[in-house]
Amino acid sequence: MLKQEDILQDLKSLIPEDIIKVNEPLKRYTYTETGGNADFYLSPTKNEDVQAIVRYAKEKDIPVTYLGNGSNIIIREGGIRGIVISLLSLNHINVSDDAIIAGSGSAIIDVSRAARDHVLTGLEFACGIPGSVGGAVYMNAGAYGGEIKDCIDYALCVNEEGDLIQFTNKELELDYRNSIVQKQHLVVLEAAFTLEPGKLDEIQAKMDDLTERRESKQPLEYPSCGSVFQRPPGHFAGKLIQDSDLQGYRVGGVEVSKKHAGFMVNVDNGTATDYEDLIHHVQKVVKEKFDVELHREVRIIGEHPKE
């Protein structure tokens, strides 16, 4: 890879200098409050800048990592080499008739609220999902009986060559916590949702109910990575973990939540290594006790810390 100072000069010639940060600590951008530094942390505000960065990185063989709002991800303390592209500044939300077009970095909660404000129904389920639009499409996020595939019209993505590709709902191949975005290593830049006219009092009542249920059941008072495991067929991950007597089990500063066994919370300056070790322990115990494999929903990226 090129020297850091050479990459910096190249980037300054490609994109606005004020969106470039060098050796940027990533823990401030994740819900777990863990993670080392990024060699380069870039915050583009336009799709064209994303394309320019991706094409440059491809040409120079520099690895690229994308970050949304860091709600369902663990970044290791060794940090991330190459370029990290933050999508948070791609945060426009435009409403027209029964459609909403939102940038990848928009919070899906804010899109849900925009739908409510325009008396549109269909996104109430997302009122408590902490992720970004890009992350929500990436994993077909869902909650309380609704999921992204129920309401998305299309997504505009960028591929590893820096080309823009638009995918319809069907072409996105949205499945349980999966999509073509994952399979083809794409990144969502924008998504459009088609909703239905509703009644404001009914929309608000549903959102209030879902918010209350979320706040009463989830450990929102601590840093966490959200739901750690996918739902195994025929089971609930949280119930299996609870029945394995693992609630409150701690590795370092991270423990299985006493409030909801499907969550792991950072209660005392925990590290990404603590999270990983705890995840492996829980997987091992549940496998031994119930012969059920727990697969991670949370993404783990970055390098392990040097010894």
From Swiss-Prot:
Q: Which reaction does it catalyse?
A: UDP-N-acetyl-alpha-D-muramate + NADP(+) = UDP-N-acetyl-3-O-(1-carboxyvinyl)-alpha-D-glucosamine + NADPH + H(+)
**Which PROSITE patterns has this protein been placed in?**
FAD_PCMH
Provide the alphabetized UniProt keywords.
Cell cycle, Cell division, Cell shape, Cell wall biogenesis/degradation, Cytoplasm, FAD, Flavoprotein, NADP, Oxidoreductase, Peptidoglycan synthesis
Q: What class of enzyme is it?
A: oxidoreductase
Q: Name one GO cellular component term.
A: cytosol
- Give the enzyme's EC designation: 1.3.1.98
- Look up the record and name the cofactor or cofactors this protein needs: FAD
Name the residues annotated as catalytic in the UniProt entry. Answer: R177, S227, E297
Location in the cell: Cytoplasm
Give an example GO biological process: peptidoglycan biosynthetic process
Gene Ontology MF terms in the entry? FAD binding; UDP-N-acetylmuramate dehydrogenase activity
Domain named FAD-binding PCMH-type is located at 34-198
Associated pathway: Cell wall biogenesis; peptidoglycan biosynthesis
Tell me the protein family, please: Belongs to the MurB family.
Role, per record: Cell wall formation.
**What's the protein here called?**
UDP-N-acetylenolpyruvoylglucosamine reductase
Which species does the entry assign this protein to? Staphylococcus haemolyticus (strain JCSC1435)
